[in-house]
C-alpha cells in the first residue's frame, strides 16, 4: 500500500514538472534524431544543403581519377560490361599500322633531329565511351577527319610526350627527363608544337593507307576535355592503337582511335589476307611483266584460202588427190595469230625463202584483242 502511494506521488510530481503542452523537448529530440538519421542516410531536407566533395563531383560528371576501375568490376555494371568487345579481325589494318610505325620513326627523327624510336604496343577493340573514361588526364586530344571516308578519328597525346616534345624542340639537353608542371592548362606554345607533331603523324597515316586506299587525314580541332571530343556514340565500337615513342630518356604515348563506322567503306579491303610486303599495285612487277610481254614469241600463220568440204571427202582422201583453191598468184593472204586476224599481205620470195609483205595495218579485231591484254 505504501509502495502504491509512493508511485502515485512520483507520477503527480512528474506531471507537474512536464505539463501536456510541455512535450516540445521530446518532440524536438525526436525530430533531431530523425534529422540525424536522415543525414546519415543521405536523405531528408538537410541533404540538399550539404556541399559535395571532389570525389562525388567527379562521379557525378563521369570522371574516374583513381584509375583502378573498381566500380566497373562490381555489381550490375560488371554484368553489363562482362561481354568483351569482339569484332572481326582486319588483317590488312595490322599491316597499315605496321607501315605507320616505320614511317613515323623516320618522320619524327627528321622532325625532332633526335634519336626517336616508335613501337606498336597493341591493337584492340573498345567501346568509345569506355575509352573516353579511361583517358589519363591531362592530355591533348586531336579530332581529325578522314576526307574520303567521310568520318572522324581521334588521336590522344599523353602529358609525358607533350612535355618531351616541347623540351626537345626548344633545345632541351639530352639525357635529362622533361619537367612536368601539373595543375595548369597547356600554353599556346605547347599546343602549337604538339599540333605540328600531330600533323606529321597524320601525314604518315595518309601514306600508310595509300597503297590500300587513298585517304586524306586533316586536323579538325584540339581538345583537352574528353567530353568535347565525342566523335561517336558511347556504345559504338572502335579500333584502338597504342604507340610508344621513346627519345633516349624521354618519351610518351600516342593513342589512335578509329571507329568501325569510319573504316566501314573500306572494310572489304581490310579483310584481305596479306600476301607480301607490298599490297595493291606493284610498279616493279608491272614493268617486268610489260618487258617480258614484248619479247614473247607468238605463232603467226599465213592463210592463203579456206574451203568447206564434206567430211566424207576428207575421210576418203588419198595420196595424189588434188584440192583446188579459190586463189590466184596475185591473191592476198591473211595473217593470223591463233583465231585473231591481224592483217593481209602479198606473197613473194626473198633470197631463198617465201615471204609475205603486209599490205594493210592491223585490223580492228587485232587492236581490240591487244587492248584486252593491257
From Swiss-Prot:
<dbReference type="GO" id="GO:0071978">
    <property type="term" value="P:bacterial-type flagellum-dependent swarming motility"/>
</dbReference>
<dbReference type="GO" id="GO:0050918">
    <property type="term" value="P:positive chemotaxis"/>
</dbReference>
<dbReference type="InterPro" id="IPR028976">
    <property type="entry name" value="CheC-like_sf"/>
</dbReference>
<keyword id="KW-0283">Flagellar rotation</keyword>
<keyword id="KW-0975">Bacterial flagellum</keyword>
<dbReference type="InterPro" id="IPR001543">
    <property type="entry name" value="FliN-like_C"/>
</dbReference>
<feature type="region of interest" description="Disordered">
    <location>
        <begin position="1"/>
        <end position="48"/>
    </location>
</feature>
<feature type="compositionally biased region" description="Gly residues">
    <location>
        <begin position="32"/>
        <end position="46"/>
    </location>
</feature>
<keyword id="KW-1003">Cell membrane</keyword>
<dbReference type="InterPro" id="IPR036429">
    <property type="entry name" value="SpoA-like_sf"/>
</dbReference>
<dbReference type="Pfam" id="PF02154">
    <property type="entry name" value="FliM"/>
</dbReference>
<dbReference type="Pfam" id="PF01052">
    <property type="entry name" value="FliMN_C"/>
</dbReference>
<keyword id="KW-0472">Membrane</keyword>
<keyword id="KW-0145">Chemotaxis</keyword>
<comment type="similarity">
    <text>Belongs to the FliM family.</text>
</comment>
<dbReference type="GO" id="GO:0009425">
    <property type="term" value="C:bacterial-type flagellum basal body"/>
</dbReference>
<keyword id="KW-0997">Cell inner membrane</keyword>
<protein>
    <recommendedName>
        <fullName>Flagellar motor switch protein FliM</fullName>
    </recommendedName>
</protein>
<comment type="function">
    <text>FliM is one of three proteins (FliG, FliN, FliM) that forms the rotor-mounted switch complex (C ring), located at the base of the basal body. This complex interacts with the CheY and CheZ chemotaxis proteins, in addition to contacting components of the motor that determine the direction of flagellar rotation.</text>
</comment>
<dbReference type="GO" id="GO:0005886">
    <property type="term" value="C:plasma membrane"/>
</dbReference>
<dbReference type="InterPro" id="IPR001689">
    <property type="entry name" value="Flag_FliM"/>
</dbReference>
<dbReference type="GO" id="GO:0003774">
    <property type="term" value="F:cytoskeletal motor activity"/>
</dbReference>
Amino acid at each position: 500500500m505504501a509502495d502504491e502511494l509512493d508511485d502515485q506521488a512520483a507520477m503527480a510530481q512528474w506531471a507537474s514538472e512536464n505539463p501536456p503542452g510541455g512535450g516540445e523537448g521530446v518532440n524536438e529530440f525526436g525530430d533531431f534524431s530523425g534529422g540525424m538519421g536522415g543525414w546519415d542516410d543521405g536523405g531528408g531536407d538537410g541533404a540538399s544543403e550539404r556541399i559535395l566533395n571532389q570525389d562525388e563531383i567527379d562521379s557525378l560528371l563521369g570522371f574516374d581519377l583513381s584509375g583502378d576501375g573498381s566500380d566497373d568490376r562490381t555489381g550490375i555494371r560488371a554484368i553489363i560490361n562482362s561481354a568483351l568487345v569482339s569484332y572481326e579481325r582486319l588483317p590488312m589494318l595490322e599491316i597499315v599500322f605496321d607501315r605507320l610505325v616505320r614511317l613515323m620513326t623516320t618522320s619524327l627523327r627528321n622532325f625532332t633531329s633526335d634519336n626517336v624510336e616508335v613501337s606498336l604496343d597493341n591493337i584492340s577493340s573498345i567501346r568509345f565511351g569506355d575509352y573516353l573514361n579511361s583517358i589519363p588526364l591531362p592530355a591533348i586530344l586531336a579530332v581529325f577527319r578522314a576526307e574520303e571516308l567521310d568520318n572522324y578519328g581521334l588521336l590522344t597525346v599523353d602529358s609525358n610526350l607533350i612535355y618531351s616534345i616541347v623540351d626537345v624542340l626548344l633545345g632541351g639537353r639530352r639525357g635529362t627527363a622533361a619537367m612536368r608542371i601539373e595543375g595548369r592548362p597547356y600554353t599556346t606554345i605547347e599546343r602549337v608544337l604538339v599540333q605540328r607533331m600531330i600533323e606529321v603523324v597524320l601525314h604518315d597515316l595518309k601514306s600508310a593507307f595509300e597503297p590500300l586506299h587513298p585517304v586524306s587525314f586533316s586536323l579538325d580541332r584540339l581538345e583537352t576535355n574528353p567530353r568535347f571530343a565525342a566523335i561517336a556514340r558511347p556504345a559504338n565500337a572502335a579500333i584502338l592503337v597504342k604507340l610508344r615513342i621513346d627519345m633516349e630518356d624521354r618519351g610518351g604515348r600516342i593513342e589512335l582511335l578509329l571507329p568501325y563506322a569510319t573504316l566501314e567503306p573500306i572494310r572489304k579491303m581490310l579483310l584481305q589476307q596479306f600476301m607480301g610486303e607490298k599490297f595493291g599495285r606493284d610498279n616493279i612487277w608491272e614493268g617486268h611483266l610489260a618487258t617480258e610481254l614484248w619479247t614473247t614469241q607468238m605463232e603467226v600463220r599465213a592463210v592463203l584460202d579456206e574451203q568447206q568440204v564434206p567430211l566424207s571427202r576428207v575421210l576418203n582422201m588419198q595420196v595424189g588427190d588434188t584440192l583446188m583453191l579459190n586463189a590466184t598468184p596475185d591473191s592476198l593472204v591473211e595473217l593470223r595469230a591463233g583465231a585473231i586476224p591481224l592483217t593481209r599481205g602479198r606473197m613473194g620470195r626473198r633470197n631463198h625463202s617465201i615471204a609475205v609483205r603486209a599490205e594493210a595495218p592491223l585490223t580492228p579485231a587485232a587492236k581490240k584483242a591487244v587492248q584486252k591484254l593491257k
